[in-house]
């Protein structure tokens, strides 16, 4: 598989970003094992209140500064609970951050981990651990609605974007009220505009508030509604022709 880094295509094993993700995946997996957590969902708030960081003999966590973390509005039903879980996951991540930096610098010849947002990357993995997501997503054919039922403490947005950390190539697009909010890929530089197939799926999901999956013109596209009375968000997972086997 190939991912894009600094504007060029590279194999996963040749990319420092891949090494970082594996390091963080392993760290979170160790944390889950020591906390005797063997299946989702992860209640980060309960872990925080239970002082779970002590299981790895880590420093007590601190509430991260706004500059150090990703602040987002999940735009979904139950947003307050999802936000609470995200903040708790970020706070837990602050206690794992030091160990992550030590491992990263050891792996890279004491090169300082400058500019890496460890807290956000770890928090995403606490709510949606890679070793679970990889097998569960494959078994569910990457169905976001079904994944949300399993990883219910994580926002749809986080679950969708975590698919980019898996081996399967795809483009994830988040559309809010008809405007592209995020469009990211693990296999290419995604076109700024939607393909005809993506646009067709988006229009159907937006108008009907129902999931849609289409294979047309070489594109494989699945779309899901995350709709509220005053806000319409759609999330697409697309596989472009050049990324298919």
Question: How does the language model describe each region?
Answer:
Residues 1-245:
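Active-site hotspot residues in diverse enzymes, especially metal/ion-binding acidic/histidine motifs
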């Amino acid at each position: 598989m190939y991912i894009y880094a600094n504007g060029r295509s590279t194999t996963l094993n040749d990319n420092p970003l891949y090494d970082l993700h594996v390091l963080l995946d392993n760290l979170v997996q160790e944390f889950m094992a020591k906390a005797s957590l063997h299946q989702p969902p992860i209640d980060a708030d309960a872990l925080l209140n239970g002082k779970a960081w002590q299981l790895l003999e880590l420093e007590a966590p601190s509430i991260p500064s706004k500059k150090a973390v990703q602040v987002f509005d999940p735009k979904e039903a139950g947003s307050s609970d999802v936000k609470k879980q995200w903040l708790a996951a970020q706070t837990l991540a602050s206690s794992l951050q030091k160990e992550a930096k030590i491992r990263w610098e050891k792996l890279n010849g004491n090169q300082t981990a400058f500019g890496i947002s460890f807290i956000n990357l770890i928090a995403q993995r606490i709510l949606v651990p890679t070793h679970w997501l990889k097998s569960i997503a494959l078994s569910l054919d990457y169905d976001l609605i079904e994944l949300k039922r399993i990883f219910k403490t994580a926002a749809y947005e986080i679950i969708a974007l975590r698919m980019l950390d898996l081996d399967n190539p795809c483009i994830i697009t988040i559309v809010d009220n008809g405007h592209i909010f995020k469009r990211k890929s693990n296999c290419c530089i995604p076109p700024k505009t939607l393909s005809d197939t993506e646009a067709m799926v988006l229009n159907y999901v937006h108008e009907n508030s129902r999931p849609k999956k289409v294979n047309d013109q070489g594109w494989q596209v699945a779309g899901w509604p995350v709709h509220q009375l005053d806000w319409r968000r759609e999330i697409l997972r697309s596989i472009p022709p050049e990324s298919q086997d």
